[in-house]
Every structure is written in C-alpha cells, then in structure tokens.
C-alpha cells in the first residue's frame, strides 16, 4: 500500500524541505521504496537539496498536460525517485494546480512512500497539495508564530478529512523561551512524534547537496531523523546512539 505523506507547515523557513529530503534518504536506507515530489511550484527547493534542480522535465509540464507523470520522474543516485518542480518562473504559465490531486493518484501502487513537499502558506497551491495527500506530517519550530501557522494548516487538513499523523518540532535549542512539547501538543491537538535539534551540520549538508544522514550520520539531527523514519515505517530501534558505527549497524539491522 502506498502512503502519500505531505510534509506541511503553514509557515516558511521551518525546515520542511530539509526534512522531506532527509526522510526520502532515510526511508530508502531502511529498504523502503520512496518517491519524493516537489509540489512547491512557485518556490521549489527540493531539487536544490538533491542536486537535481535543472531537470528538463518537471511537475509543471505534467500539470500543463504536456507529458505523462513518469516522464518527469528521475532516479536519484541514493536510490529513491524524484519528481522535481521547475525553478523558472516562466514555467508557471499555464499550470493547472487543480490537476495535482488526480496526477498524484497516478503514483498509487508505485512506491511504499510518496513524500510531498509543498509551498508555505495556505494559498491554492498549498491547499491543492493537502487535498492530494492521504496523510499530513506537520513541521514547526518551537515558537508561537510557527505553531500558530501549523495550527492553521492542521485546521485546513482536518476540514478535508486528512489524517494528521503527528508534528515534528524542528531546530530545538533547549532555550527557556521555546514553547514546550506539552504546549505544542495541546495547541495542535496532535502528537509530537519527533524533536530535531538545531545542528550546524544540517546547513553544511545542504550546501553539499547531501542528506545529513549521509554527510554527518553521527550528528544529533541525523540520529533523530533516522528515529522518525523508523517510526513512520513501523520499525523499532534496538538502541540509540550518536556513534556513527552503531548508527550504521542500526540501519543494516532494520533493512533485514
């Protein structure tokens, strides 16, 4: 069964694209068949994270009816497949975002996981992505503006009868001014399923166009993303460690 999961936030800059790219890698490392989709048509960045931002055929071409969906799908060297969006504003002309839901149905049965990144905010582009997904994974930073926007996204998703599987609290620093996990859970009325700490290695990995789990697999953020991927796939970690050799052994064990 294919799980189509939209990584959504309501607010830009909280790290949902970074999380999407790293989950695609992590789930693939765990032996899952993954397709990542950049459904952010106006300001796409997922291709930049993957080093595949100059693809000749994109989701915009599919939404214009120019090509079939499979013609805009590429296999990344890390093993997952990727459907990019064009970074050129000229390619927005003639795009029918209302077709996104039907287009995404074409991926049913072709992967274990379809991970969608989408535009920030709650405009038609973002709501079309919500409509096209089966499940929603919220991402927020531990501050009130981020959580408030995540709440708006949650309300839209609930209005469409979408299953919100949880919220990821990203870039935590352990500071007194941050909203606590209990407060975030109470405000959003969804479980907090991961806390990813602020980690300077994440910015370095983005610049290198490599997932943090590949670039610095022993970093705190990489370990938490692996835990999240394991939780999404229903796997249980035997142990937890920031030691790279132990982390690799965990991945190898879970792929059996």
Predicted regions and their residues:
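P-loop/Walker-type NTP enzyme "switch/lid" segment
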Residues: 36-109, 206-208, 214
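Conserved catalytic-core segment of NTP-binding enzymes
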Residues: 102, 106-109, 113-204, 208
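NTP-binding/hydrolysis catalytic cores, primarily Walker-type P-loop NTPases
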Residues: 212-256
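Conserved beta-strand scaffold positions in the cores of enzyme catalytic domains, especially
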Residues: 4, 82, 192-195
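Generic secondary-structure signature for well-ordered alpha-helical cores
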Residues: 29-32, 109, 113, 189, ...
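Residue-level signature of catalytic and energy-coupling elements of molecular machines
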Residues: 12, 17, 38, 62, ...
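Short, conserved catalytic or interaction motifs in soluble domains
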Residues: 9, 29-32, 39, 85, ...
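Walker A/P-loop phosphate-binding motif and the immediately C-terminal alpha-helix
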Residues: 3-39
């Amino acid at each position: 069964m294919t799980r189509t999961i939209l990584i959504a936030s309501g607010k830009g800059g909280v790290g949902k694209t970074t999380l999407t790219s790293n989950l695609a890698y992590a789930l693939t490392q765990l032996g899952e068949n993954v397709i990542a989709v950049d459904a952010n048509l106006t300001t796409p960045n997922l291709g930049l994270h993957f080093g595949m931002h100059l693809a000749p055929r994109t989701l915009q071409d599919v939404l214009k009816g120019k090509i079939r969906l499979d013609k805009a799908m590429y296999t990344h060297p890390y093993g997952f497949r990727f459907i990019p969006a064009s970074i050129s504003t000229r390619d927005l002309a003639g795009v029918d975002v209302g077709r996104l839901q039907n287009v995404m149905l074409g991926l049913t049965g072709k992967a274990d996981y379809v991970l969608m990144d989408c535009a920030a905010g709650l405009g038609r582009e973002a709501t079309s992505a919500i409509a096209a997904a089966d499940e929603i994974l919220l991402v927020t930073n531990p501050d009130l503006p981020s959580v408030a926007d995540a709440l708006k996204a949650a309300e839209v998703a609930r209005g469409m009868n979408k299953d919100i599987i949880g919220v990821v609290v990203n870039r935590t620093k352990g500071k007194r001014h941050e909203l606590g996990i209990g407060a975030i859970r109470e405000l959003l009325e969804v479980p907090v399923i991961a806390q990813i700490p602020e980690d300077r290695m994440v910015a370095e990995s983005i610049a290198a166009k490599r997932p943090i789990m590949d670039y610095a697999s022993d970093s705190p953020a990489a370990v938490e993303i692996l835990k999240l991927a394991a939780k999404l796939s229903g796997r249980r970690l035997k142990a937890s460690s920031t030691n790279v050799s132990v982390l690799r052994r965990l991945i190898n064990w879970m792929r059996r």
